[in-house]
């Protein structure tokens, strides 16, 4: 739970209170949710229907040009180009929640994401394997925790971001299991998560090196509790 601090003073016979509620996660709550019967059932479904013994990569964000979804997809395409032995052995789950309609910049971004996913799936997909699963619908929290828990790799590459709670939620959901977190160095979480593989989404070389390293760089991730 967030740690709260507050200060109060009397101003013109009214009490004014300032409350500080730092942004963060609740690792114990996430772990308890992961271990619940309902989420364990969802994890089983993911492993049976999507993972099927493959390496599973999860990326969760919003449909936003600052979130680096298009850069991530192009890096994944390059991975499949240079690593044909991974065809059929890896699947990317891209969950990016669509923005409110009516804003052209976000509609253009969503269209670009959908077209890129379609092109990559059409280029590399087989009858028994689809390289990318995409959803732009909001996923219930229990289900996203299940995806985090089932995923071997979490890939978060915003061009610029604040703390980025997704990275810390993945760490909490994988507690005791290990995992690989590929994280943009332009997130606040990059300085509070031990064991993350840092990358630069503006650099093809850095992105390629990071995702090449991730499948063999399984580690016990830890987020500093001082930031929630």
Regions found by a protein language model. Give the residues of each.
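Active-site helix-initiating loop/hinge in glycosyltransferases
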Residues: 67-69, 75, 164
């Amino acid at each position: 739970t967030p740690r709260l601090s507050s200060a109060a003073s009397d101003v013109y016979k009214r009490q004014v209170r300032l409350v500080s509620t730092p942004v963060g996660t609740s690792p114990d709550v996430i772990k308890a949710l992961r271990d619940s019967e309902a989420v364990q059932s969802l994890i089983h479904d993911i492993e049976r229907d999507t993972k099927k013994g493959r390496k599973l990569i999860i990326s969760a964000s919003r449909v936003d040009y600052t979130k680096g979804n298009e850069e991530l997809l192009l890096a994944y395409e390059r991975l499949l180009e240079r690593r044909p032995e991974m065809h059929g052995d890896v699947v990317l789950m891209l969950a990016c929640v669509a923005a409110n309609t009516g804003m052209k910049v976000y509609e253009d971004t969503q269209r670009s994401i959908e077209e890129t996913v379609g092109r990559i799936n059409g280029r590399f997909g087989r009858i028994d394997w689809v390289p990318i699963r995409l959803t732009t619908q909001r996923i219930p929290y229990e289900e996203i925790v299940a995806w985090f828990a089932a995923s071997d790799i979490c890939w978060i590459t915003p061009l610029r971001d604040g703390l980025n709670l997704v990275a810390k939620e993945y760490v909490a959901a994988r507690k005791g299991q290990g995992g690989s977190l590929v994280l943009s160095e332009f997130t606040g979480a990059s300085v509070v998560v031990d064991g993350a593989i840092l990358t630069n989404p503006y650099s093809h070389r850095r992105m390629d090196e990071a995702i090449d390293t991730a499948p063999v760089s399984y580690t016990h991730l830890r987020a500093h509790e001082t930031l929630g």
